[in-house]
A protein has these predicted regions:
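Active-site anion-handling motifs in enzyme catalytic cores
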Residues: 1-381
């Protein structure tokens, strides 16, 4: 049996895309352990996988006292993880396969908890896979290396992470993010969409947080839209890809929409599932995006794309596709001037046809990398 774990819910449509694509790649019944199963059902994942809740249950009484003693003696919180997520761990079966599907969860706080999951699953006889992942090289300390070495298989979605992970765990292969095989659903286009001449834009609160000056990042988006309206006859479609409370793309996008809607050329796409969002992105002339899986939707459908990136995954994916990240990724941490995003858009516009031709040439073979990950999982059974 194959299980997917460490899934935070489908209001992050990148997470939803990973689940749908993984199901397509593995072509077998999957069990999804989710911390927000209600959101998964909202977007129809219950029609794709069997959803189980992996909620955190508070410790109390004797269990809480035992945890405190264990923590004092060992300095580890693994006891807390094991018992607060006992619904998941009680279901772990010897010989079953468990895919950690967060992708870049090791790049954020809480990687010790990921290590706890990995260790406990192995103690119960399960096999673990670090699936479609990215990893910041600077995050590889001794404790993390010990954890990473424990995985039975690692499928790295870009070469920067691959080199880092391969040095620690020889069971590491280079693949493409599973979402490159995501199905596309084309809904009717909204009024005002210019067929073949609509520029897609995705912005996120996370980008504003990662920028040295969040105000400059927002101003860069404002200036970009104004620049497109002033220098082209294209329409602009604002497309959200994450709608989680306190991290909702619709907040900055709605603010931008309200400012520029009087132009008659700016549209705001509402929330949809990831396949439907890919349908809109695939029909854009070009795409400028902050969310990784929004940009993957563009790359995979050969839409010339500029990424406003903040991590290794953006750089690594662009480097693997184009041979360089220069001009294709604007690191948000380095953003100093509101004109930079518009300047990079101008480069994209000037090279639009050559970029599209390159994507059409390389994408079929690149997408096949995702299937090598599925083949590697089948060999674990």
């Amino acid at each position: 049996m194959i299980n997917l774990y460490y899934h935070g819910g489908s209001e992050n449509h990148g997470c939803e895309a990973i689940v749908r694509s993984t199901s397509k790649l593995l072509s077998t019944k999957l069990f999804l352990w989710s911390t927000a199963p209600n959101t998964d059902c909202t977007y129809g994942l219950d029609n794709v996988v069997s959803i189980q809740e992996d909620g955190s249950v508070p410790l109390a009484g004797l269990k809480l006292l035992t945890f405190k003693m264990h923590h004092k003696l060992t300095g580890s919180d693994i006891f807390y993880t094991k018992f607060s997520h006992r619904n998941f761990f009680s279901a772990v079966q010897c010989g079953d396969i468990y895919l950690s599907i967060g992708g870049d969860n090791y790049c954020y706080a809480g990687k010790d908890i990921l290590g706890h999951y990995n260790q406990i699953i192995h103690e119960k006889g399960g096999k673990t896979v670090f699936w479609g992942c990215s990893f910041e090289p600077s995050e590889m300390d001794a404790a993390t290396a010990k954890d990473i070495a424990r995985y039975n298989l690692i499928t790295a979605r870009e070469s920067i992470s691959y080199e880092t992970l391969k040095a620690v765990n020889p069971n590491t292969i280079l693949v493409a993010d599973p979402a490159f095989v995501l199905d596309t659903v084309e809904l009717p286009l909204p009024e005002g969409w210019k067929d073949g001449n609509t520029i897609g834009i995705n912005a996120s609160p996370l980008i504003m947080q990662c920028a040295k000056d969040g105000g400059v990042a927002y101003e860069a988006y404002r200036h970009l839209i104004k620049h497109i309206l002033d220098t082209t006859d294209a329409a602009v479609a604002l497309i959200p890809h994450v709608v989680i409370e306190n991290n909702d793309d619709r907040i900055p996008l709605r603010n931008l929409y309200e400012e520029f809607v009087p132009s008659g050329r700016v549209l705001l796409i509402e929330d949809h599932n990831c396949c439907e969002l890919k349908g809109y992105i695939s029909r854009c002339r070009m795409f400028i995006g902050a969310r990784t899986h929004a940009t993957i939707a563009a790359y995979s459908t050969c839409v010339p794309t500029l990424v406003l990136g903040y991590s290794v995954k953006s750089k690594g994916i662009a480097r693997d596709i184009f041979g360089t990240e220069e001009h294709y990724v604007l690191p948000v941490q380095e953003l100093r001037d509101k004109n930079e995003l518009a300047d990079d858009f101008d480069w994209l516009l000037a090279n639009e046809e050559s970029i599209r031709s390159h994507l059409k040439c390389v994408m079929p073979e690149y997408i096949q990398r995702a299937y090598t990950a599925a083949e590697a999982v089948s060999r674990l059974k």
